[in-house]
Amino acid sequence: MTMIETAKAPQAQSHSGLLLDVKDLRVTFKTPDGDVTAVNDLNFTLQAGETLGIVGESGSGKSQTAFALMGLLAANGRIGGSATFNGRQILNLPERELNKLRAEQISMIFQDPMTSLNPYMRVGEQLMEVLMLHKGLSKAEAFEESVKMLDAVKMPEARKRMKMFPHEFSGGMRQRVMIAMALLCRPRLLIADEPTTALDVTVQAQIMTLLNELKREFNTAIIMITHDLGVVAGICDKVLVMYAGRTMEYGQARDVFYQPSHPYSIGLLNAVPRLDAEGDALLTIPGNPPNLLRLPKGCPFQPRCPHAMEQCSCAPPLESFAPGRLRACFKPVGDLL
């Protein structure tokens, strides 16, 4: 039995209309060695209350996708394509409008909570600042609302914790603070960039359970960026598999996990340790992700793919092969399974 098979499947959500529509998203960085395309013509949609998992190895473009949507690209970054949020184009918004959007509609949880919290400010002050700045609450009102949100994320002794500094919290508790801060303004979209990477497995499970509960309570859509397929299996409705900035596969989470249609997806799933496996050897994908300055001709996964053929020297188009499913591979699905 795999970790994926034992993970609790996400419950059916009550979705209520298209919230985010990303079309041909492209992120390019100018470097001394040339232009680097970190995200290459990405397409996906997200309904209200739905969770999308974006998975792939390091350097696949997952985080840059999130930074592009949040308007947080580095100074040398350039963005193309479109992203329509609640009927409004959000790419390249003026700074003032972008700040308002991030304050009221879209929030992000970053990978390392210790570097995201100000070590010189008490946690309560950092939470209250959000509400006083963006919601116009008084100090007393912001304090009580912050305590309520810490209670909502299962923070023990929430009122007492308001007076503590970040270094007095464990990693899991700091991440709960970050989740509370992200949800204070009741955003419609929450982007979580590797939110459990720095946590032990027990705390990971607690955080994922918490996100599931909060998703149901607030009907918040979530983009979950991770390399942990167990995390995706436990919370996500849909999965987008990325490699070298491109979509390899896209579809419902259950379909991708139980009937993967791309060699890269199969490789990622095979690399998950199995509880019933004999011996100590772990399966891996041979080789390393490509240098984005020197991508191989055609399919970027070709040099590592066990099913590579001559046709793969041309880039396969991303095509629909079943309802709600896309893949970029020339190999027939039946020949992969």
Region locations from a protein language model:
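Short catalytic/signature loops enriched in Gly
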Residues: 13-18, 156-160, 250-337
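A short, proline-enriched helix->beta-strand linker immediately N-terminal to the Walker B motif
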Residues: 184-188
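Conserved ABC ATPase "signature" region
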Residues: 88-89, 141-160, 269-270
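Conserved ABC transporter NBD signature motif
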Residues: 79-89
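A short, flexible loop at the N-terminus of ABC-type nucleotide-binding domains that lies
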Residues: 15-19, 28-41, 72-78, 94-97, ...
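ABC ATPase NBD coupling module
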Residues: 76, 90-107, 125, 133, ...
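P-loop NTP-binding/switch modules centered on Walker-like glycine-rich loops
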Residues: 71-72, 191-195, 199-280
